[in-house]
């Protein structure tokens, strides 16, 4: 950033992190992210993680190892700075590991499994559910066909530094069969393979489509994996489309069986040329050790989905700002972020580009009605808070959770600003027919923006609009207020 690596950037670490934010903890580099010993010493780096100096087994051969020691012995750097680094490391140790009351703890316990399952369940996003095909009604079916390699693929492993050595992992097919038990037949066809030749994949494709003709419902479980050029570190994706010709497979499955549910296991957005042909789409992400159980719970209605998208799904890759400006991938050394502050949904709204699925989108098996926003005041000073209240009602026939999202529009800013920005969200659980009042407190932090010339956050006087809804493209109520000088 501005000529210095971020791991030892004076402005970011000394001025902003420690100065402006008052951070007194430890700064650890990214793996191999330290490139200059003197800058690392002076600019706030405390611990170096990984290095490009020699082999990884050379314990002292780090930029904050032998080179730092040499400078200290030659009195070319201050011991005072070293002492501050040591103090911060010791402070971290006492805050975490060295408390007298620290419990022994457990690993991979039943409580951990329950927590993992709940986290996975709450993160699953129901993108589409035409004709209420979900949840699956087992009582009306005789045969379920599961298609897709990700139905049987363990995802906690691989992926570079995101790899986890888990005690176990419930894959989706296992979770589905465990839930269904012996009530109905569950068949499986891979449909494709991430390691097979094209001729083998063609055969897998044909067999899956053939099997789909005789199924009451098809649960397609595909997406991506942790292989290179997918959801893996170090290399970018080569295409916005799904790999292994999955788009063609999904389209062919939809022709022979309209009762098709696409469950996508991946950590990223992707093109969906088949989305109009598939009545239900579920974004399951990488759900961890309990992924299979969580997916089954949502598909069969034991859990009402309540996840929301943390980013927009563009229709095509060119809709993204980086590609619209032709700024990606840069010249191999430098990438210029020409979109500025207009990132994600801010870019789509500025350019009036309709995404495939918007930021914050996520459906439920029930429905929620939003009432009218009320404000505790209509005019405030820049240092005041304002309380926003909105009633939310579960108007459906089953319990569910809704993530209420609050956005703010700066209507009179002196600088270009996004149409609106997310400034708060709350998740509320509601029984059928229940109404709760959801409150938000908005203050200086939510109303301010950063001015590069003044190097500070400011709240300008003027008119602001509060917008509350169930997604960035589904605003249900709004109200305005003014900030005075």
Show where each model-derived region lies:
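Short acidic/histidine-rich active-site segments
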Residues: 23-57
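Long, well-ordered, tryptophan-enriched scaffold segments
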Residues: 44, 57-100
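Catalytic core of the metallo-beta-lactamase
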Residues: 11
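C-terminal non-catalytic regions of proteins with extracellular/luminal or membrane-system context
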Residues: 3-8, 18-22, 28-37, 65, ...
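Compositionally biased, low-complexity linear motifs
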Residues: 45-52, 56-59, 373-375, 444-450
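Short glycine/proline- and acidic residue-enriched helix-loop micro-motifs
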Residues: 102-110
């Amino acid at each position: 950033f501005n000529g210095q690596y971020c791991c030892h950037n004076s402005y970011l670490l000394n001025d902003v992190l420690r100065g402006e934010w008052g951070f007194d903890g430890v700064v650890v580099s990214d793996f191999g992210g330290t490139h200059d010993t003197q800058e690392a010493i002076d600019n706030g780096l405390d611990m170096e993680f990984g290095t490009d100096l020699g082999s990884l087994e050379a314990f002292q051969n780090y930029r904050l190892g032998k080179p730092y020691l040499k400078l200290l012995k030659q009195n070319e750097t201050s011991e005072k700075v070293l002492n501050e680094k040591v103090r911060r490391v010791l402070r971290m140790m006492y805050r975490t590991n060295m408390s007298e009351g620290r419990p022994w703890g457990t690993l991979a316990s039943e409580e951990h499994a329950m927590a993992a399952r709940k986290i996975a369940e709450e993160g699953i996003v129901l993108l589409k559910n035409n004709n209420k095909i979900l949840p699956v009604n087992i009582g009306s079916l005789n045969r379920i066909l599961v298609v897709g390699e990700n139905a049987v693929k363990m995802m906690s492993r691989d992926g570079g530094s995101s790899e986890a050595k888990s005690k176990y992992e419930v894959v989706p097919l296992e979770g589905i069969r465990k839930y269904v038990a012996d009530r109905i037949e569950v068949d499986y066809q891979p449909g494709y393979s991430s390691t097979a030749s094209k001729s083998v994949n063609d055969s897998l494709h044909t067999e899956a489509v053939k099997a789909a003709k005789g199924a009451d419902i098809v649960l397609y479980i595909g997406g991506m994996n942790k292989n290179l050029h997918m959801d893996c570190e170090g290399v970018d994706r080569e295409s916005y489309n799904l790999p292994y010709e999955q788009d063609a497979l999904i389209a062919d499955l939809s022709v022979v069986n309209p009762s098709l549910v696409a469950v996508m296991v991946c950590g990223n957005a992707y093109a969906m040329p088949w989305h109009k042909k598939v009545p239900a789409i579920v974004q399951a992400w990488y759900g961890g050790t309990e992924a299979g159980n969580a997916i089954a719970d949502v598909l069969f209605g034991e859990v009402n989905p309540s996840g929301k998208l943390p980013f927009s799904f563009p229709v095509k890759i060119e809709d993204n700002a980086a590609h619209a400006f032709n700024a990606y991938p840069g010249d191999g050394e430098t990438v210029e972020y020409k979109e500025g502050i207009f990132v994600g949904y801010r870019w789509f709204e500025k350019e009036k580009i309709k995404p495939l699925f918007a930021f914050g989108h996520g459906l439920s098996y029930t429905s929620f009605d939003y009432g009218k926003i009320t404000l505790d005041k209509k005019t405030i000073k820049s240092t005041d808070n304002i309380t926003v209240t909105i009633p939310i009602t579960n108007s459906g026939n089953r319990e569910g959770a809704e993530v209420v999202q609050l956005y703010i529009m700066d209507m009179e800013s002196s600088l270009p600003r996004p149409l609106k920005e997310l400034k708060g969200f709350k998740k509320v659980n509601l029984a059928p027919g229940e109404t709760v009042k959801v409150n938000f407190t908005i203050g200086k932090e939510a109303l301010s923006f950063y001015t590069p010339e003044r190097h500070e956050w400011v709240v300008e006087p003027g008119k602001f609009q509060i917008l509350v809804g169930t997604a960035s493209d589904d605003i249900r109520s709004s109200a305005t207020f003014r900030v005075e000088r």
